[in-house]
Amino acid sequence: DAKKTLELQNEVINDVAPFAEKHGLLDQCMAWSLAHAHIMETTAMQLATSFSCLLQQLIRNVMEYNMDHQEVPMTGDHFHSFVVNSLVEAALYSFGGSLMSSDLHEFCRMIRSLTTIPLPSSEEPLTNFYVDVNDGQWHSLQTCVPKVNVDMRTILDTSVVIPTVDTLRNQRVMEAFLNSRLPVILCGPPGSGKTMTLSNCLKTMPHFDVVSVNFSSSTQPSLILKIFEQYGCYQKTPNGLVLRPASPDKTLIVFCDEVNLPEEDKYGTQRVISFLRQIVEQGGFWNPRDHLWVQTQNIQFVGACNPPTDPGRV
């Protein structure tokens, strides 16, 4: 219930607070990250939001564990170990997730030098490990990679995902961001597996529906409105007009591929991107047909794009 959730959040805060002090682990991770190049331009607010999302996932993991182990919930050393180790993991992916590969490895070494928390072997980067909710300790992701037999008839099928350390790592982080209900951007060169990462992750998350749309240089807000008409449901409520997914028990993910392709207008605005920002920041949009404000509920956006340094990208 709400009381237990609040108590759990306060317990987590008590364990996290020492690392959030000035010149503490989180402060130094933030400063280090902002001083290095990312695959896309980033800000302190974006990094802090990412960390908050992963911290929320930490709390969800504890709540789910306690629901499954009501007779022996997570307490004492188990709870403390899980929180502080998950804190390091959250800092690793929130502040370092969009760094270049070489900088990410250096970031892992920097984290090791800053904390007295027992961390796994320094022979491998921290990104090859995860924190297990069952004991609160670090374990190798390699131990979680299942052995699969691939049918030769499906070897050329691009929808087939062979589990690896990389796919498992991406899935864990992606699930946390999707559960936060905040927009997500996947950025990487062509063929790096952006679409595959999302598709593979959603296989284990049945409470999401996804619709994909490919952006081009001429994409306009009208395309998003058509998506809403087809996959959403407008409902009149005492608080005004509300747009929800057609399936009331699910969240609709609008996957916008090549999201940085639309051209700027003469005022320097990418109109479809501004429209998406309005929905995300204001929680709705102005319907041009009915001249009414529409509040959106359970609709989430995920974008994929090539690095902005590529030709034709904005």
Model-predicted segments: where are they?
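Conserved catalytic/switch belt of AAA+ P-loop NTPases
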Residues: F228-T237, F255-T309
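Short helix/loop capping segments that flank catalytic or ligand/cofactor-binding pockets
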Residues: T195, L223, E263-D265, P311-R313
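Short glycine/proline-enriched turns and hinge-like loops at secondary-structure junctions
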Residues: I185, Y267-T269, V314
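Short regulatory helix/loop adjacent to the ATP-binding pocket of P-loop NTPases
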Residues: C201-M205, P308-V314
